[in-house]
Amino acid sequence: MSAAEEPFIRDTTTSIPLDAFPFGVRPRAAAGRNEAIKRLIDVVGAGSLLVLLAPLMLIAALAIAATSRGPIVFRQTRLGQGGVPFVFYKFRSMWSDAEDQIHRQYVESLIDGKLDEINQGDAQRPLYKIKRDPRVTPVGRILRKTSIDELPQLVNVLRGEMSLVGPRPPIAYEVQHYQPWHLRRILEIKPGITGLWQVAGRSKTSFDEMVRLDLKYMRERCIALDLKILLKTVYVVLRCDGAN
């Protein structure tokens, strides 16, 4: 674990100081009369999915335990609404001793606009995903391809840290490289398991385009749009169009 992430690990209830946001950007409370309905859908949806998918999750857990050492569930500190840190859950898809410095450098270069330097001009390289990543286990590749690795985040939804639909929750070190306009995606609404950018292009979307789609969702969000995104997510997952 890097030193830069340690403060967030020690106290996951303390938000980022307001003066940490540059150029006067400040969190704004989420507004809208649909918030209560959205929360109800989150609780009912996440709870129902956990029950329905419990056998699949058990199979995934057994496969992880049988093929590699380490915890079954990967825990990582992410930033939620208003920059508040929380513990984010996924099924572990990497070797337990995997070094995160590779991903850190990739993400920092991506956000800083140095994509060509690391992708050799391939603008369609999967966002946040390193192609043929040697850190990923054989079982992990299947979990990622089918998006099964994301299922533990349903617990985050029940806990109120995430929503079924919303922007992707960033890692703390990513935000250090955000431009001011990028920050809105983590300030105003809860992060989600799926969102507009995931169903629009999944992992093939560029970073700036991802942020634009997140902001578009924030402007236009309503229950009908959430339901549409959820239905499209089912279609995308059934196509196994997840990360490689």
Could you describe each region identified by the protein language model?
Residues 29-105, 109, 156, 219, ...:
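A hydrophobic, helix-centered structural microdomain
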Residues 24, 32, 45-47, 66, ...:
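Residue-identity detector for glycine
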Residues 14-19, 73-134, 194-212:
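Short, glycine-rich, amphipathic interfacial segments at transmembrane boundaries or analogous
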Residues 1-23, 127-130, 134, 140-244:
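Hydrophobic structural segments characteristic of membrane proteins
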Residues 1-53, 111, 116-119, 244:
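N-terminal hydrophobic signal-anchor/signal peptide
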